[in-house]
Swiss-Prot record:
NCBIfam families: GTPase_EngA (TIGR03594), small_GTP (TIGR00231). One of its GO terms (molecular function) is ribosome binding. The gene is der. This is GTPase Der. HAMAP family: GTPase_Der. The lineage of its organism: Bacteria, Pseudomonadati, Pseudomonadota, Gammaproteobacteria, Methylococcales. InterPro entries: G_ENGA, GTP-bd, GTPase_Der, KH_dom-like, KH_dom-like_a/b, P-loop_NTPase, Small_GTP-bd. It comes from Methylococcus capsulatus (strain ATCC 33009 / NCIMB 11132 / Bath). One of its GO terms (biological process) is ribosome biogenesis.
Amino acid sequence: MLPVVALIGRTNVGKSTLFNYLTRTRDALVADFPGLTRDRQYGRVQRGERDYFVVDTGGIIEAAEGIDDQAMKQVDHVLDEADVILFLVDVHAGMTAGDELIADRLRRINKPVLLVANKIDGTQALIAGAEFHAFGLGEPLLISAAHGTGVHALLERVEALLPESGETGETEAEGGIRIAVVGRPNVGKSTLVNRILGEERVVVYDQPGTTRDSIYIPFERRGERYTLIDTAGIRRRARVNEGVEKFSVIKSFQAIEKAHVVIYLVDASEGLTDQDANLLGMVLEIGRGLLIGFNKWDGLEPEQREKVKRQIDVKLPFLEFAKKYFISALHGTGVGVLMDAVKPIYQSAMLDLSASRLTQVLQDCLTAHPPPLVRGRRIKLKYAHQGGHNPPVVVIHGNQTEDLPAAYRRYLGNEFRNAFKLQGVPLKLVFKSAENPFQGRRNELTERQIRKRRRMIRHVKKR
């Protein structure tokens, strides 16, 4: 599971500014979920070899300004979920009663806490951070989130404290094909999980996976071993208070990251929402095999069904590779067909692609449709090899590949997909250009060449 970094602090200390700085400068994606919150509060950060989630808990701590017990319980839930906590304070405002209350709670937990003194612009840094030593949380890290001052050093400290993302509480090799059931609240995730397990009539048990309480449910189907990653129950508990509600999104992300295949469930009676499209975009970016189940299909009138199918064409054009199934989790209609598709998708995700076959497919593509000219020169694509699994990654080497148009990249992706009969998985293409050995080098003239050049210049001037 990917680790979680939580930003804690009072209102207007710069949590959102720091969050925006981190997500603006990361190498991967940020997920926005307008259906859950009006603010950008959930981000996935990839920096070098480190990969983790960052959460702006602004709304939680703002609720705590009243210093009531219920608000502090929400803070406690945040602290339980996070691996590293960044406690932000405002050097201009100095120490406040709200800061002291939060610091008192942080001193009692057994988790890494970094004290971050923000807004050091226009102040003497050492003097600005001095008073915060009184919190007893170590040396304050002085930053300006607005301008990025000190943020690089802060991230180095954070990443040194994070657990490795591969550390989990269950043995991956023993679980078979891992399936994550993901979707918005109340779309029937728990019903689908119970239907899948009930159909097979096997004895199952809840195996706690990590400290984040994802539930791993092993079962067998037609002699094949599977593990359901069930996050459905997590979201039910999320209704209790806002603190857990926010982290339910992170739990969904972690379930997607852990899975081989994702079953994304949509409530067909409500149609496709923007939140559905955002979550599906996350699955695509992470690169997992995907099945989309439209639940409660049996309760729709014919005109409603046509409306949903039109929505699929309009809102999900980027998921042409994903199979869509129209099911009823409650009555079991279509669930068997849905499960039959899981194994072929897993096999596509883990397929070994030989370099010779990939290069042959590439050459066939070039023969049928050569790359376009760029600045009068044709882009050269030379050979291809596999770069990874789940999702399948194809690395293509050539010259000027950075100038290859998006349309031609899509053409290559479709041809590779068809050639290897990949089902239900995104295919990632990585283009690499050969390095120019002379780039950045200047020809150093000898003394003799310099004297000759000067004579030539004088000769030209005399003429």
